[in-house]
């Protein structure tokens, strides 16, 4: 697994073969960031259910102002630290060990411009998205990775799916608040 583009392009990340660890593939990450394009530059990003940290590190590589990595597994938070060190990333991030579903009552200090969630495929992705949806900035975008076979809802607590991308066994749902016509 490697960083696709940006200042850290080509850096290799550690991705152990743990039961339940399912890193976002290089191909799907490349598709995601091609869609997000300039939206990443200067953004505050939440990489939820972060696993290896690959999505958040890719965001740092492409100019995100700050990335918050959240994962409930101690091994994952340690892995994220190692992967950040491998890439010589010294600042511009926070790593939090927490279960997004259970610990979402603690809001962040500032809203996120981009929220990426990759919950375990056996979890209900909408439950995790609901837990952090209010952390999204007014013009922010929530991206949910889920099993293609199970799908994801068209709307989650006031956020509407604006796009879906399918690749292999995975899919990405892009959610935003509806624009108010005025």
Give, region by region, the residue ranges found by the protein language model:
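Class I S-adenosyl-L-methionine-dependent methyltransferase catalytic core
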Residues: 1-182
């Amino acid at each position: 697994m490697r960083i696709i583009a940006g200042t850290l392009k080509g850096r290799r990340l550690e991705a152990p073969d743990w039961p339940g660890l399912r890193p976002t593939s290089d191909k799907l990450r490349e598709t995601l960031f091609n869609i997000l394009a300039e939206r990443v530059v200067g953004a505050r990003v939440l990489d939820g259910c972060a696993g290896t940290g690959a999505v958040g590190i890719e965001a740092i590589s492409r100019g995100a102002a700050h990335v918050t990595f959240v994962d409930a597994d101690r091994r994952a938070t340690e892995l994220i630290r190692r992967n950040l060190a491998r890439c010589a990333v010294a600042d511009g991030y926070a790593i939090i060990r927490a279960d997004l579903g259970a610990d979402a009552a603690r809001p962040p200090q500032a809203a996120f411009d981009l929220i990426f969630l990759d919950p375990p495929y056996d979890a209900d992705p909408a439950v995790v998205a609901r837990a952090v949806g209010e952390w999204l900035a007014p013009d922010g975008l929530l991206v949910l990775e889920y099993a293609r076979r199970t799908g994801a809802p068209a709307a989650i607590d006031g956020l509407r799916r604006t796009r879906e991308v399918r690749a292999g066994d995975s899919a990405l749902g892009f959610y935003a608040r509806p624009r108010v016509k005025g």
